[in-house]
Structures are given as structure tokens and as C-alpha cells.
Amino acid sequence: MKIKILTTLIGLLFALNGMASERKLFDDHWRFALQDSATMSSPNFNDNAWRRLSLPHDWAIEGDFQATNPSGATGGALPGGIAWYRKHFDVPAFDRNKHYFIDFDGVYMNASVYLNGHLLGTRPYGFISYRYEMTPYLKAKDNVIAVRVDNSEQPNCRWYSGCGIYRHVYLVSSNTLHVAHWGTFVTATTDGKVSAEIKVDNQSQRREVVTLRNTILDSSKKVVSTTTDKQTIQPDVQATFNVNMLVNGPKLWSIEQPNLYVLRTEVMRGNRVVDTYETTFGFRSFHFDAQTGFWLNGKNMKINGVCNHHDLGCLGAAVHRDAIYRQLKMLKDMGCNAIRCSHNPPAPELLELCDSMGFIVMDESFDMWHRKKTKYDYSRYFDAWFERDLSDMVKRDRNHPSILIWSIGNEVLEQWNSADADQLTPEQANLILNAGHAITHDSTDNGTLNVNSQLTKRMVDIVKQLDPTRPVTAGCNEPSPDNLLFKSNALDLIGYNYHIENIKDVPKNFPNKPFIMTESVSALQTTGYYMMPSDSVRRAPQEWWMPYTNPSFMCSAYDNMHAAWSSTHESTWDVVKNNDFVGGQFIWTGWDYLGEPTPYGFPARSSYFGIIDLAGFPKDVYYMYQSEWTQKPVLHLFPHWNWLDGQQIDMWCYFNQADAVELFINGISQGIQHKKPHEYHVKWRVNYEPGTVMVVAHKQGKVVRQTEISTAGAPDHIRLRAENSTCKPGGLAFIEAEVVDKDGRRCPWADNQLYFETEGNGEIVGVDNGSQFSMERFKANQRKAFFGRCLVVVKMDSPASKLKLKARGIDLKADTITIESSK
């Protein structure tokens, strides 16, 4: 009996030494202080009084909007600074024969990481993911990791960046034999052929005979292919395995059916698995054609995409999968099929969701190269870091089937020989960047490429060395063939930002080059605000150098207002839709975002560009796209029906699957309207009278659907509506609070102050109302209604049972809603 027990213990110890790598979240039990001292890196520093929190965390979003914040309105008018994060931890199963790493998905910015007082490294770029090895300085107990985050020199970004460890952190333990960090590159063709390049590190001091077992699993975890390979790896050497496999009858990854597979790679020493590494991938084919545009799996289609910045509204830059999913789900319902990551590598969660939900992705590296756009931006670090940062982005992301395009930059000033934004304010720089510059030449007589063209080629070469399977582009706002990025002839895909008037010349200027609108539209809208007459299109500002003022700090929710360099939604879509060679577009933007409040300055502090506002309320133009991009029946009538007696009102309607629509006011027809060529809405100009306005859609003489809007009475009560009635522990619930009349109609002019409180296992983590100029804090338990509504975001604690949210307001009946827990 004793012999059996001893054998079991020895076997257990032997097995533990061969256990596979582990990668665990390292987000909890951090300490935080918005202060700076060199002593804070020391493991002996007393941090007992520091704030306790969990990651991801963005300290800027917790602050007040102020005109004096150095980020300026373009950066969201929120504070920056220097802060430290510290975490005390043990490693219960500490093994001297293992290697330990810490992975940061993203820290903004200039993050210096210390372990037990030893500097592991400093990374300037706030949007890149990276890893440090901790092994030499790690102990079994009483470890301290300390991270100094420096976002004090501002402005350094043309939009809201956030501050802090705003993405997830992971603790990784590996055996001496393991798949390298981002060490797989999987390509798969529609006929089922899979090729995998797999890099295996031998960090031991001996030669190792390694067996590599690869297994492909489908979405139901069924094994569909296996193979084994063997190599001898010398000490402290990284070996490359080139593996070929076959899956019979693979299910393809597509927009409609985003089928995913997993390559499970097992590193074996003898018969023992010492490391397991999983890579998600998909089978698909695609190409861009200079005459016919974009093709996916043999199907010609348009890329109906949007650009999005990385913030999550009232949550700031702090990553949460539920909030990203909410953004993508609303865009998917609109018919959007593509995301441009503007203008930086995104959170891994976004790419994972794009894989599983069926979005095409344009993954972008930088907003600037050598030449700065703001005083303290990444251009200061570009020469020292661009090769590593660009390489790391591609290595991290290249297995995602959703990514079909790499972008090496956005509106970089290297398009021109002489272009400089150094002496401009961020607001001026944003405007001039889209206005263009004079083209000059300094190429030598012998045809040598301009230095900016050489840099373009160098960056494309870096991408192609790591991934030759995808096209490379850049978002260019200089449409001339003399653009120095285009002159490099290195870009596979010509990308224009705006300039729809130049698109007709693309086939002539760039023969045999495929084309896509890398950025388009830049229309300006505030949810619920309408400027009439609606057929008067407003440029704001009229020219990029002109000021624009409006005491309301709002923009029209009709599609009749856009920035000086841009165009309306309808006019842009008409060009994209009716030119076969245009592969598609990425609209600026899918969602409003913090910062860049064109055309205004402070107190405006978030953008007007989105199809969906910052709180997640769709603007009316959302339904124009839904009517064009989906097969869903659409009949959207706007604006609301609460005006002054006799006031002349323009009623718009977006619709599809009908020949004509007829408007009625209190039962009296106002006429039948048909869509005109190159227009995507119909309009009636009518005189307001209280009651009901109704629109009826006809097809082949039959009524197919109808909708109506009635005049709302005085505010009577609050109505709470949850987008999701259940929530996982640690998950988010998004709850709309509306001010309604006694009959339940939303009061479109209501601006009541609403107060919120929770009961149970959870907390309020953010409030918003979609206003681009509200000075109210996002981290609060109250919010004014904006055109009759606002948003409350609650987080369910873990473990969770249920959470009640109560809303009240002066002279308003209260409401309560319950969010149940889900597993």
C-alpha cells in the first residue's frame, strides 16, 4: 500500500513537471494611485492606503470635463497625468523549471513595468500588446508587480485615448518547451487545405526531441483532422514546424455564416504533453478586383463598413466584451459587415467578436509616422519603435479570419513632401488633414524613390514578410497619383479618405489597381435635433479654416449637415453603390466617440459623426442604411410630432420593400411619395397640428406596412427598458430610461434630471444620454434626459443573483427594473 501511494506521488510530481502552459487573467486585486514617485517601483513601498480596483481601468473617464485639461476638446477634455498600479501576489505552484510571463493587452501610454523592483521594460505605444518574461525575478511568495503609466504630456492623440491599464492583463506559465508567443500562422483555403507555421521555443539547456501533435476541431469540438511531426531542437533555439493538413468539406467563414475552426497544437516530450496552444481560424477566399470590386468566397459584394474608435462611451477606454458586443450587434442589425480599427491595433476582444459575428476587419497600425499631428504624439517614438510595433500587430492578429486588410497608416503627413501640423492646434490639424496640401517633388533625376515612398515600401515589406496573404493599404486623404504613398507602388489596395468627387478618376489614375473608400462621409448629427429646411445642406465649417458657431452646440439629425471635407450619407452611398469598381467603404463613424467634436470646440467634447450616438441610441440615418443593406422591412418616419401649432415641418421617411409611401396627418392624406433616382428618402413639408402622423407603405397597390407617431403630453413617469434582461456575473446590462407621458409616449423635449439607485449584487458603472456637450460626469448615479431619454449601465457582481435598478425624478412616477443573473 505504501509503495502504491509513493508511486502515485512520484507520478503526480512527474506529471506536474510536464503540465501544459497556463494563461490566466491577472486583473483582480490591483492597487492604484494617481501620483508619481520613483520609490513606487520598490517592493517595500507602502501602498496600503491606495485605492483597490480590478482591471481593465481608465482613470480619465472618472474625471471632470474641463476646458483647462491639456487633452483639449479634441482629446475629450478629460484629465491625463501619471499614475501607478501595484499588485502583490504569490505563485502557489511556483516551479523553478518553468518560465513565467506577463501579457499586457494595452496600456495607455508610456508604461514601465517593474517586478520586485526590477525594470522589465518600457513600451511607449499605448495601443499595442506585449509580453515580458518574469522568470529571473519571480519568487514563490511576496511578489510585487508595479506599472508606471505616463499620459501627462498632452495632447498626444487626436481623439480620446483613455489613461491606464485599460485592457486585460494575463499571467502565463510555460514549460521550457512551448509554442512561442504569437507563434502560429495558419492559412486555410476553401478546398480544406490548411498550412500552419508553428514556432516552438526550447528554453532548456539541453537538446530536445520534440513531437508536435496538431488537431483541428470544428465548431462543435469534433476532431476533423490530425497530424504529428517531429524535430530535434537545440538548447535556447526556436524551431519552426511547417505543417500541412486537410479538412474534408470545410464550412466556410462568411458574413452570414462565420464558421470557425480551432487548431490545437500539443508540444510533446516523449509521450507527455508539455504545452498546448490553440489557434482559431477559418476557411475563406477573397480578392479585390480593379473592375468589379470585392469578392468573398466567390461572391461579389460591397464592403459596407464603418470606422470606430476604441472608447466605449461612458465606460471610457476600459475594455469590456459586453460593451463591444453591443456596439457590433447594433451595427450588424443595421447591415454593416465591416469594421475599420481606427487608427490603431484594437483590443483582442473586438477581433474575436468580429470572427464569431461575421465582420470583415481592416486592421490599422498608426495615425502618424515621422511627422506629428499633435505635439506629443507617437511620432516621437516612431523611428525607434515602428518596426517592432507593426510586426507585433501583425503577429498577434494574423490568424483572425475576419481580418482581410492591413493598413499601415491613416492620413499620414508623409503623403506630401512638405506638410506640417506641428504648430497647429489639434482642432486645426484635424481640419487641415482632410483639406489636402500642395504636391511638390524632390525625387532625384535617376528615379530614386522619395524617402516617404521608401518608408511606405519598408512598412509594406514588414507586413508581407509576416503575412503575404492579405492586401496592404493606407487611409489616404490626398487622391492624386503624386501622393508619395501611392508612388511607392507598394500598396495593394488604393484607399481614399473622402474626395468622392475624385472617385470617377480612379480607374484612369490607378489602372489595374483595386480601390476602396478607407474613410467616408463625416456627416454631423445630434440625435433628436432637426434643422429645417431639411433640403438645405450645411457644411460645418464652410471651409476648414473658418470658425463655426451655433449656440445649441448641436447638429441636424436630418442627413443635411457634414464637415468641410466630406459629404452626406446618401450622396456617398450613391457613389459607392453605383460604381462597380469601388470595393466598398468605411463610414466615419459607426458610433460617436469621445473627443474630436467637429465642428465645435469646448464645451463640446465628443463627436457628431456616428450613425449611433455615444449612449447607443441610433440616429435616424441608421434606418437609411438598414433599408439599403438588409432584407429587413424598414419603414422609419421622423422627426417626432411635438412642435408649435402651424410650424412648418419636414417629415422624412426611410423605407424599402415598397413602391411608394403615403403620409397622413390626423387621417388626412398629405400625398404619396416615390423615391427619386439617387435619393434614399422621401420628404413631405407639412404644417404641424397636434395629433397623429402616420405613413403607409404600398407595394403593387397593396398596403404592406404602416407606422405612426403621436403628439406626446406632459411628462408623467419614467419607463425603464433593459436591452438584456439577464446578465452573467461580471457582465453588463444596458438600461434605457425614458421620460414618458401618461399614455407611455416618450416626451421628445424632456430634459428632467433622473436619479438612479441599485439594490442587490451589482453597481452602476456609467450613465450617458447621447449629448455631445453635456458636462455631467459619466461615473454618477444621475443624468439629465436628453430629448427624453438617457442610459444607465450596470455591472452584475460575482456571484450574482439579481439586481434591481430604481429610477426617480421630481414630479415623475418612479420605475424599477430587475436584471436576473444567468450562467
Residue positions per predicted region:
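Extended carbohydrate-recognition surfaces in non-catalytic/accessory domains of CAZymes
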Residues: S21-D103, C157, G162-I165, W591, ...
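Accessory beta-strand-rich segments of carbohydrate-active enzymes
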Residues: K24-F26, D36, G80-W182, S204, ...
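Extended substrate-binding grooves/exosites of carbohydrate-active enzymes
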Residues: L34, R52-T68, H118, H168, ...
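Short flexible loop/turn segments that cap and initiate beta-strands
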Residues: P43-N46, E208-R213, I255-L260, N656-Q670, ...
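Short glycine/proline/serine/threonine-rich loop/turn segments at secondary-structure transition edges
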Residues: D95-K98, L138-D142, N156, V247-L260, ...
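Beta-strand-rich structural segments
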Residues: A196-V200, E266, M651-F655, V696, ...
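Extended acidic/polar, glycine-enriched regions
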Residues: K199-D289, N687-P690, I709
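Short S/T/G/P-enriched beta-strand
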Residues: T630-D650, N656-A658, S710-F734, V740-C747, ...
